[in-house]
């Protein structure tokens, strides 16, 4: 009787692992899908992407009988470096047996896919978004939101000429800051929002002033001075590019009677303006 072995299963095992891990990673991506993705521009190689910043133009009034004046702006640029190489690796013994156990297979695939997604999301949140300082709002108390403070953050976007009602503006909050928002009656009272959308019933905030709201542990809630407890940002505020989408590679190691599986990704992300620029559509809420 024919037997399915590591040799005969070799053709389908890598593909199945790849599909399962990448599918789970994609489901876990959230921030990546809410920023400006320029991956197609680095698909052919290169470790840096120079993105022109076109200077805002001001229309002039033409006087009768006068010639038009031509502008000669000096446009800047934003440099996006593809310099983050992250990975997750496991050595799994008796791979075919794991493969045949759907529960165990699912646990491994989810674990590896989640690790990659979490690493990329954490970089965008902590190293990019939370590095912005130009539109900071200082909270009155650690991890404590008020409607006035949120409106103050929105005003900073408006002062920079940005709309927050275009469906491309998001509010992320630490668990403690999110919990504080849940306690604001302006966003939770049934008399204000109606019972169908009332977080006191659903447990979900949904949106605040038209912005989707998400709780994330990538925002700190330990009460440290200056820590970012929440962030409002627009899609245009962050540039992201992945030169190597999460890939899965495997190799059987006869010395260990196990299969080594590695998932890795090569990417970069940066703010669309200088971190201290008030024109940057990113607002951080900082602990006092």
Stretch-by-stretch model annotation:
Residues 94, 173-175, 265:
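Short, structured patches in soluble enzyme cores that scaffold and shape functional sites
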Residues 2-6, 11-35, 42-45, 52-58, ...:
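Sequence/fold signature of self-assembling virion shell proteins
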Residues 70-106:
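Long, hydrophobic/aromatic-enriched structural stretches that serve as scaffold segments
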Residues 46, 87, 166-168:
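Short coil/turn connectors at secondary-structure junctions
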Residues 56-59, 64-76:
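Active-site-surrounding "flap" and adjacent substrate/cofactor-binding loops of secreted or lumenal enzymes
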């Amino acid at each position: 009787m024919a037997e399915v072995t590591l040799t005969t299963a070799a053709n389908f095992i890598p593909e199945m692992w790849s599909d399962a891990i990448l599918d789970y990673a994609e489901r876990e991506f959230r921030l990546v899908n809410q920023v400006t993705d320029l991956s197609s521009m680095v698909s052919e190689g290169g470790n840096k992407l120079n993105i022109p910043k076109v200077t805002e133009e001001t229309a002039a009034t033409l006087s009768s009988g006068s010639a038009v004046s031509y502008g000669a702006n000096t446009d800047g640029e934003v440099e996006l470096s593809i310099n983050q190489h992250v990975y997750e690796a496991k050595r799994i013994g008796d791979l075919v047996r794991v493969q045949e156990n759907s529960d165990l297979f699912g646990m491994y695939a989810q674990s590896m896919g989640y690790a990659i997604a979490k690493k990329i999301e954490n970089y965008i949140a902590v190293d990019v978004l939370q590095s912005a300082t130009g539109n900071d709002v200082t909270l009155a108390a650690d991890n404590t939101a008020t409607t006035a403070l949120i409106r103050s953050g929105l005003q900073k976007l408006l002062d920079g000429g940005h709309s927050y009602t275009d469906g491309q503006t998001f509010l992320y909050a630490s668990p403690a800051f999110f919990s504080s928002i849940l306690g604001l009656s302006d966003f939770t009272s049934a008399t204000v929002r109606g019972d169908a959308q009332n977080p006191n019933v659903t447990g979900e905030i949904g949106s605040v002033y038209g912005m989707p709201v998400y709780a994330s542990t990538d925002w700190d809630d330990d009460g440290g001075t200056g820590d970012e407890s929440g962030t409002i940002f627009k899609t245009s505020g962050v540039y992201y590019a992945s030169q190597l989408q999460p890939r899965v590679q495997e190799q059987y190691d006869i010395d260990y009677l196990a299969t080594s599986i590695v998932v890795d990704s090569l990417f970069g992300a940066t703010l669309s303006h200088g971190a201290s620029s008030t024109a940057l559509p990113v607002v951080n809420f900082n602990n006092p």
